[in-house]
Each structure stands twice: as C-alpha cells, then as structure tokens.
C-alpha cells in the first residue's frame, strides 16, 4: 500500500489525507461536488466550474480515459479534482490520455483516497467552503492560515466568457446566438 502524499485542507480546519495525481502543485478554490456517474471530462473542462475544486462522488473516476473531442472548452479552468479512486489504466477505444496525464498537462492537482461522500455531506450541510490541495509535507496550520486569507475570484463569468463577437459567413438561414454561457471547444 502506498503512503499518503497529499492533503486537502478546508477552511474550517478539516484535513483529508490522500494520494496525489495530476500536477504537483498547491491550488486553492471553492470546493464543490458533482454526483454524475459519467462525464468527468466534460465536468473538468466545463467553464461553469471555473476556479473550483471539483469533488466526484462516484467511486471510480478516469476509467474510460480522456480524448480531445469531448472537451467542453479548450482551456479548462478548474483548480483541482478530488476523487475516491482514480483509474490509472483507462480502457476505451476512444482513449487518448489518462486523467492523470491530462491534469499534469493542464497543471491541475488531484487527490484520491478521499471519502468523497463524507466530504459532500459536509459541503451540503455547511455550504460554500474554501479548500486547498497541497503536498502532505506542507504544514497544515500554515496552509490553513494562507487559505483563510485567500480571496476567491468573484468575476468567473468575465474570466471564461468571450470578449468579442464572432461572425460566421455562410449561405442559408441566418442564426443569431446570444452568449449566456456558450461552451467552446
């Protein structure tokens, strides 16, 4: 059995120890949860999760891998992933990369081995909560103090929305799209 190498620290002082995957980087964000059984690639690349650390309640994530065609946006902007177990060797004919490989490439940390259902209950009972995924060797008290001082962004829509109009010339019917959160990718 491997020994723990990462920790999730919540602003209320709760510390969860787990196993690292993805980028070896400390990032803070609002901890949220997703109860879907599938669609983890779409979730990690969904602009609506900008600045958030996403907890998946389904027990095994990454089993069908990642492929370029299923990204919701070109530049995912989540701050981290929390899973019970991450699949190291995905199996699907469309698999191009493992979840671990993609998170490393995108510089997003992940932590596994966490009781995600317990964490989800905490979020449901207490509401919005900040958290940070960091190496286990980092002092939890110091990380907690820094986390409490961290201001999370409040302009997420501005960060992920297009700043200019796009025109597409063509024949046939004319269509107008008003962007209230359209995904690109």
Where would I find each of the regions flagged by the language model?
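RNA-binding accessory domains that recognize and position tRNA/RNA substrates
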Residues: 1-185
């Amino acid at each position: 059995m491997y020994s723990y190498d990462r920790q999730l620290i919540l602003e209320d002082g709760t510390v969860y120890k787990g196993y690292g995957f993805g980028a070896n980087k400390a990032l803070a964000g609002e901890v949220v949860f997703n109860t879907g059984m599938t669609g983890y690639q779409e979730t990690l690349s969904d602009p609506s999760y900008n600045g958030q650390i996403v907890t998946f309640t389904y027990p095994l994530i990454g089993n069908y891998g990642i492929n370029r065609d299923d990204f919701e946006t070109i530049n995912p902007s989540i701050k981290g992933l929390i899973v019970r177990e991450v699949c190291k060797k995905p199996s699907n004919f469309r698999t191009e990369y493992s979840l671990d490989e993609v998170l490393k490439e995108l510089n997003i940390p992940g932590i596994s081995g966490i009781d995600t259902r317990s964490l989800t209950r905490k979020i449901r009972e207490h509401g919005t909560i900040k958290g940070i995924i960091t190496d286990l060797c980092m002092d939890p008290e110091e990380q907690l103090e820094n986390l409490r001082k961290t201001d999370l962004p409040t302009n997420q829509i501005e960060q992920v929305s297009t700043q200019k109009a796009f025109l597409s010339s063509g024949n046939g019917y004319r269509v107008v799209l008003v962007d209230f959160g359209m995904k690109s990718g």
